[in-house]
Amino acid sequence: MKLKNNNRKGSFLESAFILTISTAFVKLAGLLFTIPISNMLGGEGMGYFYAAYDIYNMLAVLASAGLPVAVSRMISETLVAGNTDEAERIYKVSLRIFTIIGAVIAFAMFFGADVFAAIIKSPNSGMSIRVLAVTAFCAFVMSSLRGYFQGHSIMTYTAVSQVIEALSKLILGCALAYVLLRTELAYVGGSAGAIMGVSVGAVLSVTYLLISKRRFSKSEKPSGMPVRGDKAIIKELFRIAIPVSLGASVMSLVNLIDTTVIMRVLQDGLGYTYERANWLYGVFGNAKKIFNFPSAFIIPFTVSILPVLTAAYTAKDKDGVAKNLTNCFKYAMLLALPAGIGITILAEPIMHIIYFRTPDEANAGAPILAVFGIAVILYAVVTISGAILQSFGQVGKPLISLCVGGVIKCVLNAFLVGIASVNILGAPIATCVCYAVMTVMNLCFLKKYMTGCRAIVTNTLKIAGASVVMGVFAYLVCSPLSAMLSVRKGGLIAIILAAAVYALLVVLFKIITIKEIKSVLRKGKK
């Protein structure tokens, strides 16, 4: 059965294109935020900043994982049958439930900030955790709104809301950090100030989405079809959301445990002072921030593929399923493979380009970033395969791999960080092993759905070949350029040249054709 065309909805590539553009802007803004903030706060201030975010990510993971996925999937299935009335009911019920959950989480973060800070043995991060409470509440409200639009395969509103958040974080976050850093609060205040910009951005983003939803609903025509009751909708909502949220919660909990384990092992196991351990954790966080940059570009593919694949799978459109699976893996690997290889090879110059005012942190973070480069590739496969399994209704399978990977990560972290010659480098190594195990498990779960998708293997091998050639080229030109100029200037030129070589190889290997590029750009303009 073929799906009917709907002009109001975007295809997978159109949706992914829109979100990729917004993600590029958001990440650029994030990079412009990270550079001054990290140079202002240094290792100590960034240690407070990242510790607060680990707490936030654990408590607010529901908002960014299971809940929007559940809303998107339910609305997508409902719209296949043309029942717009039920789509509206799903939104209203989800908004009511998510608002209550968000309020509870925000309350816990605000009044329990000092307790959380003590648990992770970073007492000075309490103020930053408290400021993030507003962001947590807004995140839950946004999950319902974004899930609604994503279920319609309309990504423009989500994209604009992300840009609003990014601009507020960049402008207000930097300004407030600068001001508070110069008060008696020093690094503690500077970290909290940077996070205040994030909270204001979340409020503005929610406001924009609510206004957009009201305007969009006015153009929706009632279907007059039967609608399920609230209890049935809530039951279905949590049936889908709980496994996905548990999976995301596992990784957030693992990251929180990592924070605690790393800080405790460095202090109690290796005998480092709190200041030294916090500095090392700040360096680790800086490298992880760069790892998150290319990894974030995989999210548009997972968000876009879920409603499209769900609709095709529900309609039993085998050709549509195969086509979208192939495209999803192809475009995700086009980004992840060169990014991962490039980061591994050019880790040192990348650290010095971004953290140019803190050379000690840049030098210490380079080996960490090099290992994270491998994790970029594995993360892409894990994320894409997990989203595909969710689209097919296999929401419990990714949870299994997440739990196994999470346990392995915790055990390896405790062991590797405790080795004096390895210490903080053990954290990214454990991350790589974790994602490698999850990759193998997810691909095994997906095997029976991959019939008719042989092009995925062919495309991946071509992309890997182009990426390796690019990596060798980058390695050969970076050293002499750095010797002639400087690590930063030589590295920057090497990155630009390597990107140009990769783009040329992609066309020469016929991984992507000029016709495909023009098609995507034309759809993006629409």
Regions picked out by a protein language model, each given a short descriptive name:
Residues D114-L132, T326, T344-V376:
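Interfacial segments at transmembrane-helix termini and the short loops linking adjacent helices
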Residues K2, Y475-K526:
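Membrane-proximal transmembrane or re-entrant/amphipathic helices at the cytosolic face
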Residues F140-Q162, I374-V404:
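Membrane-interface junctions at transmembrane-helix termini in multi-pass inner-membrane proteins
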Residues S38-M58, Y187-A192, K235-I240, M263-F291, ...:
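Interfacial/gating helices of multi-pass transporter permease domains
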